[in-house]
Amino acid sequence: MNHDGISAKVKVIKGDPLTVVKQLGGPRSDLSEYEEVWIVVDHDGRDRHDFLAKCRRLSSKRTVVHGVVSVPCFEVWLNAHYAPVKNYRNQADAQAHYRELTGLSSKDAKMLPDDVPWDRGVQAAARCHLPTDSLPETDTQGPCPSTTMPHLLRSLGLL
């Protein structure tokens, strides 16, 4: 992606969040060519404070490493493009709401429909947490449900 002088590179690294951070901090990884690195993970029922601390330790004078945590899962961000999030008890609740909003079957629940309303990013940023809560700060793990995805999109100039 290249947007008004901002370029983005997406790299998929398989494994749990701490494995991802370890790989990015390893000898074969050079983050110095980037001003910012954003690592997007799901909460998945596990505390991610250790992951966020390791992201901060990866930062240098040249590169800031941010951790984005979606609680309980990334479907919180997707759901917010369609409607306000609900008070999900867990990942299964958020995923059921996603299927309800998109009409996807259980078999296709990890797919993105062709008609995702990506143009509703501003609305999604306001709806990705409960009305009684505020958007969690950058590099934090918010309450359930919430996500810090809006901070990444603001950094990219998309919000």
Predicted regions span which residues?
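C-terminal accessory helical subdomains adjacent to catalytic cores in phosphodiester-
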Residues: 2-11, 18, 25-36, 43-159
